[in-house]
């Protein structure tokens, strides 16, 4: 038997062998019987448009542009009229077969060129299918197309007796088809292997199928030479089978309950997992924002610390200059000498101008000392403030660095793994 190529059939006739039509094919004996009865013209439930290749061939030729599942009747009528006219002209004219050289010599789109094209189309028109159908009917008298063509032409060529004879033959062929389909479907369902033989003669096929079934039964009887089963044993087997069936039903219901429970648990776990992912994502975003803020604050603090260090250096330079100037002033000033400051010294007493000069000098010295002392205290206070501020900034910088290290460590620990 030749292997059925479904892909080749799908390419040859995509509408007949489409995936949407698979459900229409009969797979069981009852469906096949109903399908065969619907194909019988004498049956009251005859299908007016059976699913055959000729029927779908019309769909391929005259498919409607608006709806591909319907036939464009206007297009089909026009095409059939054109085929009729071509066939009529072909029968009335001489059978001329133009050659390629004759066609190339003609002027394209001229009257002779169009006439030559019509002759070529007439020679390859599809109305010759009727003659081919007649030849196939003579070769395969048991085919469905032969029976239908015979029934269609019976009213014109035969009398009523011949029609009844054809009807009886159709009934006999229908019975043979029914028996054949019953044998094939049951043998497939029960695992009985029927030896392949040519399917041209259905009677031989049925005989071979019956012989295969009998041989299978005989071999089974030989292999299983067990004593006959008593009624009690049959009852026990039936009870065991019913118990097994109940156990299977119980196990099936348990599996359904377990499946439902696991499905709900999976949905709940998935919802919690999604919530955890959202929470971790939100926490990660907040920590990233805090880290950015800490980085910005750290950069500002470092900048301010650098400015304060520059100011501290300038203040130290000014303080050093002030200390050096004060030391030089104490070493070179006459007001600081003991002779000048000692009121009992002879020079201060005996000098005619010593009274007014020493008084003014002492006043200037005291005022200068006051100014110098206030300036020194001011700079010392500013210097101490700058030192305290610097110490405070250094402590904040250390705290920020520790916080940054802890934040990066926490991010590395809390970073969730990538999920699908």
UniProtKB/Swiss-Prot annotation:
Keywords, ordered alphabetically: Phosphoprotein
Result of altering residue 171 to N: In strain: CLIB 630
Annotated consequence of substituting residue 90 to R: In strain: CLIB 219
Region (Disordered): 132-169, 323-363
One GO process term, biological-process aspect: bipolar cellular bud site selection
Biased composition (Low complexity): 343-362
Annotated positions of the Phosphoserine modification: 230
Residue pairs linked by disulfide bridges in the UniProt entry: none
Composition bias type Basic and acidic residues, residue spans: 157-169
Compositional bias segments (type: Polar residues): 132-153, 325-339
Transmembrane segments: none
Gene Ontology terms: cellular component: cellular bud; cellular bud neck; cellular bud tip; incipient cellular bud site; mating projection tip; polarisome; site of polarized growth
GO MF terms held by the record: myosin V binding
UniProt function note: Localized to sites of polarized growth and is required for efficient mating and bipolar budding.
Note: Present with 7820 molecules/cell in log phase SD medium.
Protein name: Protein PEA2
Organismal lineage: Eukaryota, Fungi, Dikarya, Ascomycota, Saccharomycotina
